[in-house]
């Protein structure tokens, strides 16, 4: 069983940027399409600028995603400057705010939450219960520290097969969660909704800095993160500046890999 039926409306043609096919439609359309199951990713500016060229498994995960959201406001701006075309921005946070209001999320056992630490597991469990979601400790999995390259986590895959959730939420960070989601989609034997939205959940629960809807809407969530923890996020987002050169140099084409391992 999946989280809902697929939309019968014709899907808009994807917009290819740097070899990745982004979903160009409105957020409601993305949500309805995602409800049919599959892998949803929302690459950040730093992810596109760095991981896309340095981690082949990350690139493959994005290339094979069922839906890729236009989460990066910087990428959307660059694309408009390069092509003159308006690419509608759909952030992972805006997606999650709407998704959490779907009836499926109120069903016991419907979601499995994959968390980066025991502390975040406990915090998220408390928040979900406070919001009226039927979350239980058994609905969580604390991920180990994953390495580079293709990922495998048979313990997690077995848990998904056993519990058969409609939704698997991966909150373990960009660059890693996409590779894990790619593995899970092909390993579990059915088609749950796999949401690789990482920190979007932490923005809602308070585990990370709160990002108000208006801040997200104007594309300044990155600035809020930097201001909340400059030492942690300044270097990360500085990497995204390379995205400008990549978009203007390669356009729709995939940039060459700089894989060095």
Protein language model features and the residues they cover:
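N-terminal nucleotide/polyanion-binding subdomain common to many enzyme families
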Residues: 1-94
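A short helix->loop->beta-strand "cap" motif at the edges of active sites that frequently abuts
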Residues: 37, 108-109, 189-193
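A transmembrane-helix-recognition feature enriched in membrane-embedded lipid enzymes
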Residues: 76-78, 210-261
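Proline-aspartate-enriched helix->loop->beta-strand connector
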Residues: 160, 164-174
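Conserved beta-alpha
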Residues: 76-159, 163-164
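Short, flexible loop segments at boundaries between secondary-structure elements
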Residues: 142-148, 190-228
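Short glycine-rich anion-binding loops that position phosphate/pyrophosphate groups of nucleotides
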Residues: 45-48, 172-177, 200-201
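Short Gly/Thr/Asp-enriched flexible loops that form oxyanion-binding sites at enzyme active sites
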Residues: 125-127, 178-187
């Amino acid at each position: 069983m999946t989280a809902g039926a697929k939309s019968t409306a014709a899907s808009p043609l994807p917009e290819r940027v740097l070899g990745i096919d982004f979903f160009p439609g409105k957020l409601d359309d993305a949500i309805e399409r995602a409800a049919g199951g599959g892998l949803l990713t929302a690459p950040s500016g730093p992810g596109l600028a760095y991981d896309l060229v340095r981690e082949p498994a990350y690139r493959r995960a994005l290339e094979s995603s069922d839906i890729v959201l236009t989460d990066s406001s910087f990428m959307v701006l660059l694309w408009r400057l390069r092509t003159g075309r308006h690419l509608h921005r759909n952030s992972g946070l805006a997606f999650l705010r709407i998704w959490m209001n779907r009836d499926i999320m109120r069903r016991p056992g419907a979601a499995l939450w994959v968390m980066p630490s025991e502390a975040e597991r406990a915090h998220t469990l408390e928040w979900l219960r406070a919001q009226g979601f039927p979350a239980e400790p058994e609905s969580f999995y604390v991920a180990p520290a994953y390495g580079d390259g293709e990922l495998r986590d048979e313990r997690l895959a077995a848990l998904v097969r056993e519990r058969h959730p409609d939704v698997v939420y991966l909150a373990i960070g960009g660059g890693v969660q996409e590779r894990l989601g790619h593995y899970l989609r092909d390993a579990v034997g059915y088609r749950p909704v796999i949401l690789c939205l990482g920190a979007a959940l932490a923005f809602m629960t308070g585990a990370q800095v709160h990002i108000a809807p208006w801040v997200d809407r104007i594309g300044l969530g990155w600035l809020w993160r930097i201001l909340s923890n400059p030492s942690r996020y300044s270097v990360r987002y500085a990497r995204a500046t390379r995205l400008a050169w990549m978009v203007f140099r390669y356009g729709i084409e995939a940039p060459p890999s700089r894989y060095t391992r």
